[in-house]
Amino acid sequence: MKVFILALLALTATTAIAQLDTTCSQGFRQYQQQQQPGQRQLLEQMRPCVAFLQQQCRPLRMPFLQTQVEQLSSCQIDQYQCCQQLAQIPEQIRCHAIHNVVEAIMQQQSQQHRQERQQQAQHKSMRMLLETLYLMCNIYVPIQCQQQQQLGQQQQQQLQEQLTPCATFLQHQCSPVTVPFPQIRVDQPTSCQNVQHQCCRQLSQIPEQYRCQAIHNVAEAIRHQQPQQQCQGMYQPQQPAKLESIRMSLQALRSMCRIYIPVQCPAPTAYNIPMVATYTGGAC
């Protein structure tokens, strides 16, 4: 069913924008005739969706006005850099490098447990890190990864610097990864997972006939929160970018939340798109 909906979405996205305008005008008139909740109330309900789409902790491509090219999320960049650096470290010292990652993270966290618990947590953290990095990076790491050799201070520091992206990624935990460091007593969902859950829960509580408007409000809120690039030149309308943003928002929320949203989701504000300052020519 999910593949079928995405296929229909892709088919409708390839049609001309004028075709969307027809459904937009009809949808807007129908929307005005209905007893709909207030704009502010809808936007407040969809705040988690705004937060999730802005964080982009999943590989979403949201071409809002300032986004001229596809951008990776910060977590994706951290993951890529982590795997890239880990691949460059010789196999015989990868265990040592991973130990350094564990040490670096534990040193940044408050030491509230006794030494025995810290050692137990460190061993468990090490095992989880091995499994995570092996699955995430698809790079060989010995199964029985033990710190077998002593390295000089300069080599220690160099290894730690190389795997800084790994520490950053694991601390962000934007993927469903749970590394039980000392202060973490139970497996906890990531911040992105929490926001995603809240987003889907709120979207499911909105009546079907109002979901299009709610998603449009999300796209508008994100656009208004983002800085507008101003260069010297002429004003140009940003209707294509706005419609593409809404289309991508629809696709992302359909896939993520598995909630019914009309395939032909009308854009009630399509005929009242403000002229956004986009300059062409001249110096910025």
Swiss-Prot record:
Physiological role: Seed storage protein. Might be integrated via inter-chain disulfide bonds within the glutenin polymer.
Family listed: Belongs to the prolamin family.
PANTHER family with a match to the protein in the record: AVENIN-LIKE B5, PROLAMIN PPROL 14P
Keyword Protease in annotation: no
UniProt organism field: Triticum aestivum
Keyword Amino-acid biosynthesis included in the entry's annotation: no
Keyword line: Disulfide bond, Seed storage protein, Signal, Storage protein
Signal sequence region: 1-18
Protein name: Avenin-like b11
Post-translational modification: Contains disulfide bonds.
Pfam families: Gliadin
An annotated Gene Ontology molecular function: nutrient reservoir activity
